[in-house]
């Protein structure tokens, strides 16, 4: 089974992806972790690296091509990333997580050791940067959620509850796929 998990920064995509990968024994590819590692390798914070990526399309294209290639070749995998639901053409289940900006800023502040106001400004800038890049590189409007099978609020539900909901969807898909054989 191929599952993609997408959502804005701080929405909990990595937490849900790790939960599901552990529970179901699936491999996990995280575009965000690849992006963070590249930023570190370039000696930049994420905001500066995002600006760099706006002027160097090869950064996004490399990450996106890699997740597409891996996601479409693998059988039992979770691909977590902002565009994974759009890039992995043969995904069995596409999930989008949402949460308010204030909720996501609190999470990012806690995760990255920032004050909440700084995390909010950082998150808004990052979202603008990503939206610009995705529109310019791929013609994608990131706020269009039509490619996703499930849209869930990680502000309403914690990772265990989200996992339970997605577990039910996975079970339904598995039954459906078995019946189609």
Swiss-Prot record:
Gene Ontology terms: biological process: pyrimidine nucleotide metabolic process
The EC class name is transferase
The intrachain disulfides are none
Tell me its EC number(s), please: 2.7.4.25
Q: Which reaction(s) are listed as its catalytic activity?
A: CMP + ATP = CDP + ADP; dCMP + ATP = dCDP + ADP
Q: What GO annotations for molecular function exist for this entry? A: ATP binding; CMP kinase activity; dCMP kinase activity
Which sites bind ATP? Answer: 7-15
**A Pfam family that the UniProt record links to this protein:** Cytidylate_kin2
Kindly give the InterPro entries that the UniProt entry links to this protein.
Cyt_kin_arch, Cytidylate_kinase_dom, P-loop_NTPase
What does the sequence similarity comment in the record state about its family?
Belongs to the cytidylate kinase family. Type 2 subfamily.
What's the name of the protein? Cytidylate kinase
**Organism listed in the record:** Methanoculleus marisnigri (strain ATCC 35101 / DSM 1498 / JR1)
User: What lineage, starting at the top, does this entry show?
Assistant: Archaea, Methanobacteriati, Methanobacteriota, Stenosarchaea group, Methanomicrobia
């Amino acid at each position: 089974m191929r599952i993609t998990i997408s959502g804005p920064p701080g929405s909990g995509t990595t937490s849900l992806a790790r939960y599901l990968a552990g529970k179901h024994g699936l491999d996990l590819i995280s575009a965000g972790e690849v992006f963070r590692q590249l930023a570190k390798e370039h000696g930049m914070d994420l905001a500066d690296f995002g600006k760099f990526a706006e002027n160097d399309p090869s950064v996004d294209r490399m990450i996106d091509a890699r997740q597409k290639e891996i996601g479409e070749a693998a059988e039992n995998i979770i691909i977590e990333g902002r565009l994974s639901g759009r890039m992995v053409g043969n995904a069995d289940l596409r999930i989008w997580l949402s949460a308010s900006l204030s909720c996501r800023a609190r999470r990012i502040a806690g995760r990255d050791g920032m004050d909440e106001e700084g995390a909010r400004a950082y998150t808004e800038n990052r979202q603008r940067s990503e939206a610009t890049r995705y529109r310019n590189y791929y013609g994608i409007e990131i706020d269009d959620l039509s490619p996703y099978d499930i849209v869930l609020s990680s502000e309403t539900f914690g990772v265990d509850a989200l996992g339970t909901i997605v577990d039910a969807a996975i079970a339904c898909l598995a039954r459906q796929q078995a019946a189609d054989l």
